[in-house]
């Protein structure tokens, strides 16, 4: 790579998008698993105990995965904001150094 062009506004938008996605995914993962299970027990009863046990495990694993995905988006946003702040500071310092010799 010879040249790298950074457009701060694009990175700000990227960070904001990841915040929004992380929030939406996190909200999707806040279902009331206990209420879902209680409702299903009434439907499946004793006959469906094995299915319900498997479903409860699968749902718990799914919700952990959803939480992890939300955390990845939040982390991506935080890393982008931190990198952009560092870039802006370095860019300003470099510009000041150039101006000082002109």
Specify the residue positions occupied by each region the protein language model found.
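Amphipathic alpha-helical hairpins/coiled-coils and adjacent low-complexity
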Residues: 1-102
């Amino acid at each position: 790579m010879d040249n790298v062009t950074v457009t701060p506004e694009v990175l700000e938008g990227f960070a904001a998008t990841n915040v929004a996605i992380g929030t939406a995914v996190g909200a999707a993962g806040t279902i009331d698993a206990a209420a879902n299970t209680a409702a299903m027990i009434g439907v499946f009863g004793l006959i469906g105990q094995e299915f319900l046990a498997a479903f409860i495990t699968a749902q718990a694993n799914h919700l952990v995965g959803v939480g992890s995905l939300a955390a990845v988006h939040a982390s991506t946003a935080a890393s982008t904001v931190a990198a952009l702040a560092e870039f802006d500071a370095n860019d300003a310092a470099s510009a000041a150094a150039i101006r000082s010799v002109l």
